[in-house]
A protein has these predicted regions:
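Hydrophobic transmembrane alpha-helical segments in integral membrane proteins
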Residues: 1-17
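Transmembrane helix-loop junctions at the membrane interface of multipass transporters and ion channels
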Residues: 2-3, 57-63, 116
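Membrane-interface helix-loop junction between the first two transmembrane segments
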Residues: 22-41
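Select subsegments of transmembrane alpha-helices in polytopic membrane proteins
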Residues: 42-48
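Hydrophobic alpha-helical transmembrane segments of multi-pass inner membrane proteins, especially
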Residues: 65-294, 334, 338-392, 419, ...
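Transmembrane helix boundary and interhelical junction motifs in multipass membrane proteins
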Residues: 232-237, 312-316, 326-329, 397-400, ...
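TM-adjacent membrane-interface loops and short helices in multi-pass inner/ER membrane proteins
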Residues: 288-329, 333, 343-344
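A juxtamembrane structural motif centered on a specific transmembrane helix
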Residues: 389-485
């Protein structure tokens, strides 16, 4: 009977998630029909909570652990509270971004509860903390006016944060990633990436001339080199490609992007010959079976899990996800694919794609250049993180140690991603608010007038001299007229 319930539930879950994913993209068909959009958002929430219920029902049936029921109810209360508060205070927030955030949190809670109830419980505590940030940040962004002026504060705090890990950080799997304070471990690079985006956005907002680009590139290189020195190659790639995308969009010069890609290729070639851990990862990527007992073990187990799970998976609780090293973090997509099915995993990736499209669309709509660059940078961080995680788990690219946002286990990753989503919502609210748009337009006009006055002031000595030279003959003419009279 239990086996029948598990098998039936996995097909129901896949069908529900297929419908949810279809609705994510079907929404783009109705950009100017708010009633139709609202109906689709409500349908999404309905299917989302059915998936959540289905997953925890299976987990309870397979374990008969009553703690799972209480845990499910606590999650349900939290997720409903998120909707109630957002609808109460942030009426102009993006419903799709909100739905997708909660959907991915639901999936995270299901798969982490399956892997380890203790880890799921700890992750839930971080979700509670992240929810507070997600509520406060849109309000702060609406009230704050100093974000574009803190350029060197972003750079200084970010570099110090990364240097602290390099100097006193705790090494994990050959890389220095975190700072430990008693039982609490923090990964600063997860938060510094937000400061990194704000630094580049504020620099590009001021100017995109050669001097400004050179300074931006130099400081960005410091961020990346510190990560390389810490052996955090995934973080270094994430930061570098984010920088590359933002610079390319700001300058619209393709040779910069092409040069950046060539630089990455040269860096990988040099790293292969200089660093053993880089060589091991590349060998494990090219031929994992040849080093299955060593560097290739993780990738092989991930591929075995994805392959044996097939399109429909074994069902929650029926696979062997704990055979995959670091399954709750780097290889979470392999565990999802094994038990929930390849179709479910692809749907999850497409939900991530819809999030990026919404963020990119927001960037295109923002009239304020600073926030346009911020939205683009945060969207790039999110998309690249998904690409690096999924690509590493499927042998598309070498493993980088990057986690899947909102789904993988890890407090720092979860909090930073919820902060990013809170910022995206804040920009959606700013963009949708007529009053805020008017203030931004007024500020942009005043800034433009100030720049024009500064240019006129720079030319003023020459202008005054010419005016005086013009006035002298006129003055002489008047005096001569008086004399003649």
């Amino acid at each position: 009977m239990v086996h029948l319930i598990v098998q039936l539930s996995k097909y129901i879950m896949i069908i529900l998630f297929l419908i949810y994913t279809f609705l994510c993209f079907h929404l783009f068909k109705y950009p100017d029909k708010p009633k139709k959009q609202k109906h689709i958002y409500n349908l999404q929430r309905f299917y989302m909570f059915l998936i959540h219920l289905d997953g925890f029902l299976v987990l309870f049936v397979t374990t008969m652990d009553t703690k799972i029921i209480g845990f499910y109810i606590a999650q349900l209360v939290l997720f409903e509270s998120i909707y109630l508060i957002y609808h109460k205070f942030y009426k102009n927030a993006s419903e799709l971004v909100l739905n997708n955030m909660v959907m991915m949190l639901c999936i995270s809670m299901m798969i982490l509860t399956r892997i380890s109830f203790d880890k799921a419980l700890r992750q839930f505590v971080f979700v509670l903390a992240g929810t507070i940030f997600a509520f406060l940040i849109p309000l702060i962004m609406q009230k704050g006016t100093m974000f574009r002026k803190l350029t060197w504060t972003y750079a200084g705090v970010g570099i110090l944060g990364l240097l602290s890990v390099l100097v006193v950080g705790v090494a994990s799997r050959g890389a220095k990633l975190s700072l430990t304070f008693g039982p609490v471990s923090i990964q600063p690079s997860e938060f510094v990436k937000i400061l990194f985006v704000f630094f580049i956005a504020s620099m590009l907002y001021k100017s995109t001339d050669l001097k400004q680009l050179a300074i931006t590139s130099g400081v960005s290189a410091v961020f990346v080199l510190i990560l390389v020195a810490s052996n955090d190659l995934g973080g270094a790639l994430l930061y570098f490609f984010t920088y590359l995308v933002m610079i390319y969009v700001a300058t619209k010069k393709f040779y910069i992007f092409a040069g950046g890609l060539a630089f990455v290729g040269l860096g990988m070639y040099a790293g292969y010959h200089l660093f053993s851990h880089v060589k091991n990862r590349i060998v494990a990527w090219l031929d994992p079976l040849s080093v299955i007992d060593k560097a290739g073990y993780q990738v092989c187990q991930s591929l075995f899990a994805i392959g044996t799970g097939g399109l429909f998976g074994f069902g929650l609780g029926q696979g062997l996800p704990n055979k995959i090293p670091i399954v709750s973090k780097d290889f979470i997509i392999a565990a999802i694919s094994e038990e929930m099915g390849g179709i479910f995993a692809v749907c999850l990736i497409m939900v991530c794609v819809s999030c990026f499209l919404m963020i990119f669309n927001l960037s295109m709509q923002m009239k304020d250049a600073f926030y346009k660059y911020v939205a683009l940078g945060l969207g790039s961080v999110y998309a690249l993180q998904v690409l690096l995680t999924v690509g590493g788990s499927t042998k598309f690219i070498p493993m980088t140690g990057v986690t899947l946002p909102l789904v993988s286990y890890g407090g720092s990753s979860l909090l930073s991603t919820m902060i990013i989503f809170g910022m995206i919502q804040g920009m959606y609210i700013m963009q949708a608010s007529p009053e805020k748009r008017r203030k931004i337009d007024d500020k942009r006009r005043k800034d433009h007038e100030t720049k024009n006055r500064q240019k006129q002031t720079a030319k003023e000595p020459g202008a005054q001299g010419s005016q005086q030279r013009r006035r002298k003959p006129a003055a002489g003419g008047k005096n001569s007229t008086k004399t003649q009279k």
